[in-house]
Amino acid sequence: MGKRWLPSLALLPLPPPLLLLLLLLLPTNASAPQKPIYMVMVPSLLHAGTPEKGCLLFNHLNETVTVKVSMESVRGNQSLFTDLVVDKDLFHCASFIVPQSSSNEVMFLTVQVKGPTHEFRRRSTVLIKTKESLVFAQTDKPIYKPGQMVRFRVVSLDENFHPLNELIPLLYIQDSKKNRIAQWQNFRLEGGLKQLSFPLSSEPTQGSYKVVIRTESGRTVEHPFSVKEFVLPKFEVKVAVPETITILEEEMNVSVCGIYTYGKPVPGHVTVNICRKYSNPSSCFGEESLAFCEKFSQQLDGRGCFSQLVKTKSFQLKRQEYEMQLDVNAKIQEEGTGVEETGKGLTKITRTITKLSFVNVDTHFRQGIPFVGQVLLVDGRGTPIPYEMIFIGADEANQNINTTTDKNGLARFSINTDDIMGTSLTVRAKYKDSNVCYGFRWLTEENVEAWHTANAVFSPSRSFVHLESLPYKLRCEQTLAVQAHYILNDEAVLERKELVFYYLMMAKGGIVRAGTHVLPVTQGHKKGHFSILISMETDLAPVARLVLYTILPNGEVVGDTVKYEIEKCLANKVDLVFHPNIGLPATRAFLSVMASPQSLCGLRAVDQSVLLTKPEAELSASLVYDLLPVKDLTGFPKGVNQQEEDTNGCLKQNDTYINGILYSPVQNTNEEDMYGFLKDMGLKVFTNLNIRKPKVCERLGVNKIPAAYHLVSQGHMDAFLESSESPTETTRSYFPETWIWDLVIVDSTGVAEMEVTVPDTITEWKAGAFCLSNDTGLGLSPVIDFQAFQPFFVDLTMPYSVIRGEAFTLKATVLNYLQTCIRVGVQLEASPDFLATPEEKEQKSHCICMNERHTMSWAVIPKSLGNVNFTVSAEALDSKELCRNEVPVVPERGKKDTIIKSLLVEPEGLENEVTFNSLLCPTGAEVSEQISLKLPSDVVEESARASVTVLGDILGSAMQNTQDLLKMPYGCGEQNMVLFAPNIYVLDYLNETEQLTQEIKTKAITYLNTGYQRQLNYKHRDGSYSTFGDKPGRSHANTWLTAFVLKSFAQARRYIFIDESHITQALTWLSQQQKDNGCFRSSGSLLNNAMKGGVEDEVTLSAYITIALLEMSLPVTHPVVRNALFCLDTAWKSARRGASGNHVYTKALLAYAFALAGNQDTKKEILKSLDEEAVKEDNSVHWTRAQKPRVPADLWYQPQAPSAEVEMTAYVLLAYLTTELVPTREDLTAAMLIVKWLTKQQNSHGGFSSTQDTVVALHALSKYGAATFTRAKKAAHVTIQSSGAFYTKFQVNNDNQLLLQRVTLPTVPGDYTAKVAGEGCVYLQTSLKYSVLPREKEFPFALVVQTLPGTCEDLKAHTTFQISLNISYIGSRSDSNMAIADVKMVSGFIPLKPTVKMLERSVHVSRTEVSNNHVLIYLDKVSNQMLTLFFMVQQDIPVRDLKPAIVKVYDYYEKDEFAVAKYSAPCSAGYGNA
């Protein structure tokens, strides 16, 4: 009703005479002649640049009119429709495109209809949003291990899910510390997608990573993945418990099953713990105050399961102060291996015994049309309760009814609305009364009632339309018959023979369908129903809203709206099929993809074990639909929600007296009018019809009741506007985590087929595909399974390594998963490399039945050194001999399984390596070099081996080994840089000499990317870097390392992405360390104390930093550089006057710094001074330190030069080669003599002694190589021959000069001759390796190694013991540089990692690593004070006749300073567990 009268003193019922008075007051046009009708509907939210629809309705036109629709903004007016001519009745929906906009803005939309005698103009606001694409990313798996390749796809779609070849301005990878570690810019998608990849470093920051995509519109899209060290689970622990129990339940069933990833049951033992925790736990009052717990433990049954009916009494379900849930934790230990996996379950506790809720009930009622609906009765678990009586009450309708639930727990009701006089209807549903018993801290059961309130629909003529809603989600491609009920007032319809009903459908925020329905009207039949057929297609998903309305002759608009949920379907129907869907490892299978013709499909198949480790949100239609900017437009967006102009005016407030009581009209806010229905659909209406209920005029001086304009979903729309919604015989060795990651194009028939090889992992693979078509858009396949399975297979158990002379037990376990018994023959292939003896009486075959396993063992004694292969085959035999009263079968496929594993057999003692290098350059005549291989007297028998490598480039060996330049650990911030920086010099050199191949470039850039990621682990928040990163208590930033990283990152920018902020922050931090005199203050410890020597520490460090700043191409005029050069200039002038010491290391740095600064005079002056101190011998030049560690007297070969001497000599070489133009002949002559000495110091991997000398020397050699590079006209011929029969020949030419050519020398010791003839220089490198037994002698370190217990008396000593190290420095210096303690494990034992990690709590231990069978302990320095370290080890594999293991402590920068000691396991004789 338009008005409602309220007494001013008290609320009274509305008297009948007043109802007539109210109806007379309402406006009516029943007798008025028909006038032209104009109605235009447009969504209140429009998207720029995309097709939108507006619907026009013109009726009763008596003249031709023109229609104009335009938009107004601060930027001017823009026409959508211009001079559209209409000369007859019209209902039409027209498409238009809103011009592009740079940002979201509210605009005015004006509709103007003009004729000769009539003119209509309305103006309202709409929100224009910029066009948004739907962008998402997909990774090949959700979690990665360090060092793995991350592969991902970027996909872009329009709002109809069709592919967009969008330009992506920026995409980057962000690690868990918010560092950008990889970046791509300005690339365009092809076919709607792009496939990219990048490698993780071997030591990345672990945690949550993101693929971050910046779209053209500026929106940011993120896709998460994890980086973590993990071991794929062998099996899954599934815990099945009730989702909910009530406080009245006395027992619950708990079930736990262990299932292998290939679907078979796990044999083993299960432990289940069920707890109800206290809400506010305290350790002060015992375990009972923390939780009520029950524990169960037993063997799994044949199905791999355990089931228990658990009494709930012990969990005190009615106690209030405990959590309303039971936590179930299960642990299964696999039989035989002891491998453990866990699973969890959760059961909620509820006091709700029964609950009623209304289902499919309208929010409005219409007088005269029954109000129908349903209520659902469920128990506390949510299970429907059938055949129970429900009470339904509606006071406003004066109705109380009883109804019974059906088998689905639903009860239907219908309420007669004829006599409802008010504007709201409240319906109550009740099942049982709740227990009204209250107790402190006790819970009582509850039966939840349901209440529903519906508001009246306003109609002055009492004419209504009602659309039936549906309680379920509609399927795509079905046809829906929408049921429309109507009741029409005779006076309103007049003499009309028919009424036209108009309908619109909205989805995704836009008008998508429109139509009409003509209803014949006969006298006396003004109440009834009809249906409209609507086809459910993808354009309507996921939510469709329908408005149906008619215009009565009196101008009243009568209608209703309804909302339908539609399944999230996609037009491109994709299917994926494996043929077959089960297969043996290494066999072939076919994968078929069915989709719309010419679709581009992305395929993925992932090991189920990966998904168990890290579940992920599956790429689904739901996920894609969630990307839509608008899924369901309701109400008006923010900024468009102001109350619009009402042209109908208002009703005056005329008080009236009835029976002496004063009544005053007030606005009724409960009734819904047609304007409200259309607004709820997000439609703006421009019309000359009256679609609003009358408004009561406001009156001054009277307390006003504010009108509340209902908006169903305004809060949702505001949130939407403020946020951007935006995986026969077999020999198994290939075990990937992602099997398939491919793009395929479907052919014209809609099919693509690819042949794939099944990996060797026995598991279940989860495969899926998405496809993109220009015609039908996106499609997604269901996830399908492929079972990689071996009906039976064999697995080996063996140690990682043994020492020659030790014996171990090799175990082969055969598992049978066939449904029948098999007779299996197991054979260990004989080899001259080991001696194997069966440990049990040898049988030709073994009977193994379903789900059983059998283990065979051999006592093995290795006879050869190096990697020894063990090949074991298990074959199902055709045998008449019965297995448990049945004939064993032979499977048709997979009747034989072979596995190959290798064992490292190491010589006794400690391995040494000696390298002899020569640079031979024949100039017309043949040149030769004698190679004499000698061994010390204490060499371990058969441990010696030697090889010769021939290269045509002095950097050739380094290029082949850029990630293995040093046979040393790389676990700190400085050492990591030796994996990073040389790649820059290699790329620069090859670029300059035009030798760079795509293969080398790809490899070097990969190493740069991974090195970059690793180095960020050592970054501090202020932009500086330290040796072991920002660790609590050890977070002193290191000035020297920060400068090293800064210049390396700056130089790497030309090859890889480096986040500019890292460079800016490091430079800012360094500038803050600069003192007033231009020098830099030292921060953090210098791990190499060669930089600490002499009084010139500050100058040495300042020279290094200045070099770094100049190498990153900062100009000499830069304030920091200018002041730094002032510091160096002052220092050199002081040194020249003899005011300070004369440190060679410092002078070498100064010479290079002044060379970079372009100060050639000072450079020459320093080089002249250095030349006077040079060591000139063997036609080479180098420099040495005044103080250096003593070389052991018993060495029988020339040792490799110390790190500091290589480094300072390389700096002098760089100074000679750094000139304004090109180096002079004199410079190159001097450089050649230095290069001859430097190349002799290289190790067999192309590196030098340590990290910094390797980086500087390779930089210098690459610069020299580029300056002297020429292409030889003839090849160089190299011959290597012995005094005996050995002879081999190599050729080095322009095509293979980067190729590493190597030959093994047959006899050690022995004498060989190398001869080179032809043109060009040849780099010859001989590597000799051998082992020696440690012997008592004087070392620079004191090292004592002990075990606890020391003897085998303690039974636990067979399987676990403690290793204790006592270390001190007793050399020529006050303390050592950074040192490494390398503890090799006794064969068959592994370290307990938590006890190793605890070593890092020691003040001098910076880092620990477990690498293969070694424990590495990083010590920042070792002094003369004894340092004691200890950790635990435990037996992994039994080994007999254990040999002692070696512990070595060495100075990282002075490798000739070391100490070795050996230790034995307490139980060394016989088996370790005997």
From Swiss-Prot:
GO terms for cellular component: extracellular space. It holds the Pfam family A2M_BRD. Expressed in uterus, mesometrial lymphoid aggregate and mammary tissue during pregnancy. Expressed in ovary, testis and kidney. Low level expression in heart. Not expressed in liver. Keywords: Bait region, Disulfide bond, Glycoprotein, Pregnancy, Protease inhibitor, Secreted, Serine protease inhibitor, Signal, Thioester bond. It is found in: Secreted. Disulfide bonds join 55-93, 257-305, 275-293, 476-569, 601-771, 650-697, 821-849, 847-883, 921-1321, 1079-1127, 1352-1467. SUPFAM superfamilies: Alpha-macroglobulin receptor domain, E set domains, Terpenoid cyclases/Protein prenyltransferases. Residues 623-752 are annotated as: Bait region. One of its GO terms (molecular function) is signaling receptor binding. Glycans are attached at residues 62, 77, 253, 402, 654, 774, 869, 991, 1366. Residues 1-32 form the signal peptide. There is a cross-link at residues 972-975 (Isoglutamyl cysteine thioester (Cys-Gln)). GO terms for biological process: female pregnancy; negative regulation of complement activation, lectin pathway; stem cell differentiation. Homotetramer; disulfide-linked. Is able to inhibit all four classes of proteinases by a unique 'trapping' mechanism. This protein has a peptide stretch, called the 'bait region' which contains specific cleavage sites for different proteinases. When a proteinase cleaves the bait region, a conformational change is induced in the protein which traps the proteinase. The entrapped enzyme remains active against low molecular weight substrates (activity against high molecular weight substrates is greatly reduced). Belongs to the protease inhibitor I39 (alpha-2-macroglobulin) family. PANTHER family: ALPHA-2-MACROGLOBULIN, MACROGLOBULIN / COMPLEMENT. This is Alpha-2-macroglobulin-P. It comes from Mus musculus (Mouse). The gene is A2m.
